[in-house]
Amino acid sequence: MNRGALIKLVESRYVRTDLPEFRPGDTVRVSYKVKEGNRTRIQDFEGIVIRIRRNGFNTTFTVRKVSYGVGVERIFPLHSPLIQKIDIVQRGRARRAKLYFIRNLSDREIRRKLRADRKRIDQDRAAERAAKEEAQKAQEPKASQE
């Protein structure tokens, strides 16, 4: 077994598959574990994904938000065990893979550039509806057996 295959084998044990797919332009809420002193709490960071750097297990994504008039960017490792969950607040339609240009835009201009992606939003809603119906069907036989 060569070195690259061994590294992939070890990394595959730690790859997270429970996180949703998202793209640059999407607005996400990342729940991240933060350790302060001797206690741990979960901190939410909500903003626009401006970059995804895909590098296997070392994949990172950058989220940007404006807080009290100051732009804040945070880089998260995608497969980090400190990420509790990622919620997709809104799907955005971006025409570029790296959205560095939004650093120089106002909120209004950003909204104009990153329109909501209705097609992907509708697909997400349909998938959620199907999952709910599937769960209801799974519950019905249990009720009839009792």
From Swiss-Prot:
Keyword S-adenosyl-L-methionine in annotation: no
Gene Ontology CC terms, in alphabetical order: cytosolic large ribosomal subunit
Ranges for region Disordered: 116-146
Biological processes annotated in GO: translation
Subunit description: Part of the 50S risobomal subunit. Contacts protein L14. Forms a bridge to the 30S subunit in the 70S ribosome, contacting the 16S rRNA.
GO molecular function: rRNA binding; structural constituent of ribosome
UniProt keywords, alphabetically: Ribonucleoprotein, Ribosomal protein, RNA-binding, rRNA-binding
Similarity remark: Belongs to the bacterial ribosomal protein bL19 family.
Compositionally biased residues, Basic and acidic residues: 119-146
InterPro entries for this protein: Ribosomal_bL19 (IPR001857), Ribosomal_bL19_CS (IPR018257), Ribosomal_bL19_sf (IPR038657), Translation_prot_SH3-like_sf (IPR008991)
Protein name per Swiss-Prot or TrEMBL: Large ribosomal subunit protein bL19
Keyword Transmembrane: no
Pfam families: Ribosomal_L19
General function of this protein: Contacts the 16S rRNA of the 30S subunit (part of bridge B6), connecting the 2 subunits.
Gene: rplS
